[in-house]
Amino acid sequence: MLDINAFLVEKGGDPEIIKASQKKRGDSVELVDEIIAEYKEWVKLRFDLDEHNKKLNSVQKEIGKRFKAKEDAKDLIAEKEKLSNEKKEIIEKEAEADKNLRSKINQVGNIVHESVVDSQDEENNELVRTWTPENYKKPEQIAAATGAPAKLSHHEVLLRLDGYDPERGVRIVGHRGYFLRNYGVFLNQALINYGLSFLSSKGYVPLQAPVMMNKEVMAKTAQLSQFDEELYKVIDGEDEKYLIATSEQPISAYHAGEWFESPAEQLPVRYAGYSSCFRREAGSHGKDAWGIFRVHAFEKIEQFVLTEPEKSWEEFDRMIGCSEEFYQSLGLPYRVVGIVSGELNNAAAKKYDLEAWFPFQQEYKELVSCSNCTDYQSRNLEIRCGIKQQNQQEKKYVHCLNSTLSATERTICCILENYQKEDGLVIPEVLRKYIPGEPEFIPYIKELPKNTTSVKKAKGKN
């Protein structure tokens, strides 16, 4: 959330900056004025509460004097009761006003960084850079790693390897259900182990996160729309929890309420988060329906960093650089794009996506999102840094950044399309030592069903 002082001119804030940011996001500008008005109403209630406390103290003293003098104090006792009832009403109104004010502030997004493209259309995402393996020029439907024709979609390659079973998965789980089998399991575990080893070698602390969170904690790190579109709820009697959509959520709360008093020595803190993740994908009906690219349950390796505010943009570049190095080591062509202002989630001041090339589908698809959330999350979670200096008016919060390293099922999909051959799959060299037998190649062992995706695509061209 933003600091309330940022909305108030009298506190050194500039509401016009927030309004301009809201406009870039395509969100409500009027909300800023509503927050300012509600803050003033809350201040008035606080003033009324203070005044009632003063009056109550004064009346209580007078009652004491009357009792001491053995004089009648019925009128003062009646006045005290009246003031106490009024105070109770004011406390209730103040609590409700505070709740409503915080709720509205939480609806306002982070201040969009000046370098972000101002647009509501993701077609205007900024192309930052591209990378391809040496001697690969992205010819039509050619697998990047093997040079063979990319005749099959990722899910068809996995079917021919007997690497997953979607039919039984759907029968048991429902929409987008699946079982990984055989080398599907080994590939997934290889990516998990390689990803953790990769980040560990760069100084990240591996952290396996819990997959459920209390509602009150989740509310501090996930925005309201995620509760409706993304998160699964788990209810046990009156106990209400949410399954995580990313390990960023529990890891962001890992240091909640803590204070890094010596930031130069204690920060940055870098975590390599690992967890299973769960997403309803409520707004993605019919999108990426093939295979295991977009599913309800998956595994993910996440970068999460806490840093000093002055160093967060340097850390942002470092984190996207780590993800790029990871995909370069896998030999997967990709591009990095800067996300337009209208597509940023509330917490992000700026976001880069890494989109890898899928040769069968002839398109780039998102594998990584890297965001600098500045102090938007840490303010809600009260993660502070530095020793408060004399005359310092504002609290200083750490900056929080997150970046996917690998959502492993998605990464597998990209490997399957780029490492396929006519008779099987070449295993990326960096993954081989994590797979039993350290195979260089896995042959196909199953035939595809009739009228599968590649057949339909071929018919469509004829």
Curated annotation (Swiss-Prot):
It catalyses: tRNA(Ser) + L-serine + ATP = L-seryl-tRNA(Ser) + AMP + diphosphate + H(+). The keyword Lyase does not apply. It is found in: Cytoplasm, Cytosol. GO terms for cellular component: cytoplasm; cytosol. GO terms for molecular function: ATP binding; serine-tRNA ligase activity; tRNA binding. GO terms for biological process: cytoplasmic translation; seryl-tRNA aminoacylation. Its EC number is 6.1.1.11. It holds the Pfam family Seryl_tRNA_N. It comes from the Eukaryota. Keywords: Aminoacyl-tRNA synthetase, ATP-binding, Cytoplasm, Ligase, Nucleotide-binding, Protein biosynthesis. L-serine binds at T246, S247, E248, E302, T404. SUPFAM superfamilies: Class II aaRS and biotin synthetases, tRNA-binding arm. ATP binds at R279, R280, E281, V295, E366, L367, V368, S369. Catalyzes the attachment of serine to tRNA(Ser) in a two-step reaction: serine is first activated by ATP to form Ser-AMP and then transferred to the acceptor end of tRNA(Ser). Belongs to the class-II aminoacyl-tRNA synthetase family. Type-1 seryl-tRNA synthetase subfamily. Consists of two distinct domains, a catalytic core and a N-terminal extension that is involved in tRNA binding. Homodimer. The tRNA molecule binds across the dimer. This is Serine--tRNA ligase, cytoplasmic. It comes from Candida albicans (strain SC5314 / ATCC MYA-2876) (Yeast). The gene is SES1.
